[in-house]
Amino acid sequence: MKDRRFLIPIMAGIVIASVSTWRVMTNKPQDYAAQVQLESEKVIARSVTAFDFEGLDSDNRLVRLKPFLGRHRVIILFFDGEAGADKDTELLRLRERFDELKARDVKVIAVSTALPQENRAAMTADRAGPFPFPLVSDFDPTSPDGAWRIHRRWGRIDAATGKPLTGVFAIDRKGQVLFTGDSPRPMENVDRAVESVIR
């Protein structure tokens, strides 16, 4: 009987040592490059205060993001300025769902590389008609950077081609948006962005 009690701690020690060895062998630490890659792929919510922007809308009025941050939920849509406001399906879909957003006090800003007069031309009755939210031009002839400052700041420039990218972002009432690495992360589509801010 005494011999059996003596064996129990020995057996427990062997089991613990075996499990510990197995865990160490199967969970080998990654190299530094792999750890950096994992860190850059993490999705976290961060403030977009540093990503504030301003630009002229289709009526040449100055529109700025900052007054909405911390007060309202905001959807920012980067649409295809080359195709035009009357041809961009995501922009037209956002206009269709605008009443839902307005009922919940969600602000909407659409941004493109089109000039104010090009956006204004797309809003005529024989084309897309009016939009109930501002279409901001990402162009500043007085800036040394010139065009696409907003696109660059929000990570909406294709690194390989240098062309502007489309994308939609949902900012919560705290002024936060999802980030991957150092750039805000776009959502899959307008419907997903709308659902995320109205629920």
Predicted regions and their residues:
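N-terminal targeting signals for export/organelle localization
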Residues: M1-E54
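Hydrophobic beta-strand positions
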Residues: E54-G55, A170
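Residue-level recognition of short loop/turn positions
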Residues: D59-R61, K174
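Short active-site neighborhood of thiol/selenol oxidoreductases, capturing the structured segment around
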Residues: R64-L94, K107
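Short hydrophobic alpha-helix segments
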Residues: K66, W154, F179-G181
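Structural microenvironment flanking redox-active thiols in thiol-disulfide oxidoreductases
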Residues: K87-H151
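Structural micro-motif
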Residues: P130-P134, R152-F169
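Thiol-/selenol-based redox modules, centered on thioredoxin-like
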Residues: G162-R199
